[in-house]
Amino acid sequence: GVPTVNAV
């Protein structure tokens, strides 16, 4: 998929 920034 498309690389996205996810705050986990």
From Swiss-Prot:
Misc. comment: On the 2D-gel the determined MW of this unknown protein is: 15 kDa.
Protein name: Unknown protein 4 from 2D-PAGE
